[in-house]
């Protein structure tokens, strides 16, 4: 085709990162118009996409992400979790019929009952959230990690019915390797995502 795959891939990476940075620092679609339009002109004229007139201060941007509340009703939360899931090269494409929700790996209900996280904000951080099929999230939502493992990996119930696990590779890998998901796991995973 007419597109150079490498340049297009580079453009997609840059524009995705730019949109997320803008969503955290300058919320609102209108704020994106000017910088995106300028870079579209660069694409049309064959110039590299750099967003050079709209660079972010690294430390200020990191602080903005650290202080941002990634609530489940914000579009950026699900977008970043989707992007993160597909950074795993082993992640298979999901059916378009799959209804995905946001799962708290360390259950909110557990935190409300036990108050065991030293920083209560960690329960709502990206490091504690993952995409999960709705059919599984309903059953797994309030359990300890060790109890959630069977829902993540699949199991046979008392009536000998096979209950399929998640197709989210990161969760199946985590369920296979870990016996618990702790605050340090939340913090470490959050740093990787952001």
Feature map (PLM): residue ranges:
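Residue-level signal for secondary-structure boundary elements
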Residues: 20-27, 48, 73, 89-93, ...
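Extended hydrophobic-aromatic, low-complexity segments
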Residues: 5-8, 24, 28, 92-95, ...
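Histidine-centered nuclease catalytic patch
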Residues: 93-125
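Short cysteine-rich loop/turn motifs with clustered Cys
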Residues: 75-101
């Amino acid at each position: 085709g007419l597109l150079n795959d490498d340049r297009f891939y580079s453009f997609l990476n840059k524009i995705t990162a730019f949109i997320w940075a803008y969503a955290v620092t300058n919320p609102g679609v209108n704020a994106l118009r000017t910088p995106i339009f300028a870079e579209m002109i660069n694409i049309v004229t064959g110039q590299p996409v750099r967003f050079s007139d709209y660079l972010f201060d690294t430390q200020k941007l990191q602080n903005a992400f650290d202080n941002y509340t990634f609530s489940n009703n914000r579009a950026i939360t699900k977008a970043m979790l989707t992007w993160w899931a597909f950074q795993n090269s082993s992640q298979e494409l999901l059916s378009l019929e799959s209804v995905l929700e946001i799962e708290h790996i360390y259950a909110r209900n557990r935190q409300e009952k036990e108050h065991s996280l030293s920083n209560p904000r960690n329960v709502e951080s990206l490091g504690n959230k993952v995409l999960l099929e709705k059919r599984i999230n309903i059953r797994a939502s309030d359990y300890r990690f060790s109890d959630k493992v069977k829902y993540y990996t699949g199991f046979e119930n008392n009536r000998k019915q096979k209950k399929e696990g998640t197709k989210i590779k990161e969760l199946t890998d985590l369920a296979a390797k870990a016996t618990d998901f702790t605050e340090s796991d939340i913090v470490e995973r959050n740093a990787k995502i952001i």
